[in-house]
């Protein structure tokens, strides 16, 4: 297993809808282990396959000490909303307030192709929504209100990583595990 470089804002893979997984094989299991290792090394609470350059519908999470994964997810979201700050390992150092559904039910598969239902609220619900967005080629900054998005784009242009498309970790992530 390996820690893989995390793709940064500007890399086209982050804007491309990921392909469904069709082969539940050893390669998928290695990918999931690499995703978990990379997420924990970053550190973050979630990571989607496109964030390491693999355009497949897979994400991993580590919320409240529970580590897991979901393949080919689909979401059912509550109408009730939650407020919270959100960041992203592909946009290091940036965090903005963003409304998300308070509860989420994600249906998908485990690494062996067996059906899985993942239900959660608060941070887990936020994580599942954020990571599923990655699988659809959507970044959290796309969901910001126009004024916040303008601020985010300015911060991206001024970031030390601006213009790079791959991040190799050199120091702990400034959000201390709060990035998704």
From Swiss-Prot:
Pfam families tied to this protein: Pep_deformylase
Keyword set, alphabetical order: Hydrolase, Iron, Metal-binding, Protein biosynthesis
Enzyme class: hydrolase
Gene3D superfamilies: Peptide deformylase
Organism expressing this protein natively: Acidothermus cellulolyticus (strain ATCC 43068 / DSM 8971 / 11B)
GO BP, one annotated term: translation
Residue positions of the active site: 131
EC number: 3.5.1.88
Cytoplasm as UniProt keyword: no
SUPFAM superfamilies per the UniProt record, alphabetical: Peptide deformylase (SSF56420)
Protein's gene: def
Residues that bind Fe cation: 88, 130, 134
Residues in coiled coil: none
Recorded GO MF terms: metal ion binding; peptide deformylase activity
Claim: Transmembrane is one of the keywords in the record: no
Cofactor binding: number and manner: Binds 1 Fe(2+) ion.
Family: Belongs to the polypeptide deformylase family.
Catalysed conversion reaction: N-terminal N-formyl-L-methionyl-[peptide] + H2O = N-terminal L-methionyl-[peptide] + formate
Function of the molecule: Removes the formyl group from the N-terminal Met of newly synthesized proteins. Requires at least a dipeptide for an efficient rate of reaction. N-terminal L-methionine is a prerequisite for activity but the enzyme has broad specificity at other positions.
Domain of life, source organism: Bacteria
Name of the molecule in the record: Peptide deformylase
Cofactors named for this entry: Fe(2+)
């Amino acid at each position: 297993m390996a820690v893989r470089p995390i793709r940064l804002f500007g890399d086209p893979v982050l804007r491309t809808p990921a392909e469904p997984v069709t082969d539940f094989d050893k390669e998928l299991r290695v990918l999931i282990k690499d995703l978990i290792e990379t997420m924990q090394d970053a550190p973050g609470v979630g990571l989607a396959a496109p964030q390491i350059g693999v355009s497949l519908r897979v994400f991993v999470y580590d919320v409240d000490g529970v580590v897991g994964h979901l393949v080919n997810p689909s979401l059912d979201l509550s109408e009730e909303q939650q407020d919270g700050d959100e960041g992203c390992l592909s946009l290091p150092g940036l965090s903005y307030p963003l409304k998300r559904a308070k509860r989420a039910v994600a249906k998908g598969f485990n690494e062996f192709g067996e059906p899985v239902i993942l239900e959660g609220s608060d941070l887990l619900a936020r994580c599942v929504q954020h990571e599923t967005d990655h699988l659809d080629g959507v970044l959290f900054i796309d969901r910001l209100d126009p004024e916040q998005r303008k601020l985010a784009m300015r911060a991206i242009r001024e970031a030390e990583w601006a213009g790079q498309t791959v991040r190799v970790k050199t120091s702990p992530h400034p959000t201390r595990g709060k990035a998704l």
